[in-house]
Swiss-Prot record:
Record's protein name: Jacalin-related lectin Calsepa
Known tissue expression: Rhizome (at protein level). Detected in the cortex and the pith of rhizome. Not detected in vascular tissues, pericycle, endodermis or rhizodermis.
Statement: the UniProt record of this protein carries the keyword Transcription: no
Region N-glycan binding, residue ranges: 17-18, 95-96, 140-144
Organism superkingdom: Eukaryota
One example GO MF annotation: D-mannose binding
Subcellular location: Cytoplasm
Matches recorded under Pfam families: Jacalin
Family of this protein: Belongs to the jacalin lectin family.
Description of post-translational modifications: Not glycosylated.
N-acetylalanine: modified positions: 2
Swiss-Prot/TrEMBL keywords: Acetylation, Cytoplasm, Lectin
SMART domains: Jacalin
Species in which this protein is naturally found: Calystegia sepium
Length: 153
């Protein structure tokens, strides 16, 4: 049996911050969007997957800057649901070109948009039969770039 080949879409954004990558063994089942700056500014993303033993595999990107977290929103991805696409915008926030809004699309529905739809739009291809199995990008104080690891189901 052939091992599935993952492809990469993106990353979209800029070259600031440090590279990060999250490719869990099991599917991503929760995403937390953290806001800061006294408003609807997404400054951090947390991706989680549940391992076979029940423990969590988690990464948080962004959120290390001078802004304190003022709120969060949680996306729970159901057992019959899987990620198929992302879209959003990158724009200027405190003199940085960073993630300003994001929508997570699954085989069942769209979650979002989260944040403010300002700046330059981006979108991953929503290819039928593809599942997002991980994320990659760049981050420092904020999310500077984001892309996806995709696998044909």
């Amino acid at each position: 049996m052939a091992v599935p080949m993952d492809t990469i879409s993106g990353p979209w954004g800029n070259n600031g911050g440090n590279f990060w990558s999250f490719r869990p063994v099991n599917k991503i089942n929760q995403i937390v969007i953290s806001y800061g700056g006294g408003g609807n500014n997404p400054i951090a993303l947390t991706f989680s997957s549940t391992k076979a033993d029940g423990s969590k595999d988690t990464i948080t990107v962004g959120g290390g800057g001078p802004d304190s977290i003022t709120g969060t929103e949680m996306v729970n991805i159901g057992t019959d649901e899987y990620l198929t696409g992302i879209s959003g915008t990158f724009g200027i926030y405190l003199d940085n070109n960073v993630l300003r809004s994001i929508t997570f699309t699954t085989n069942l529905k769209a979650h979002g948009p989260y944040g403010q739809k300002v700046g330059t739009p981006f979108s991953s291809a929503n290819v039928v039969g593809n599942e997002i199995v991980g994320f990659l990008g760049r981050s420092g104080y904020y999310v500077d770039a984001i892309g996806t690891y995709n696998r044909h189901k």
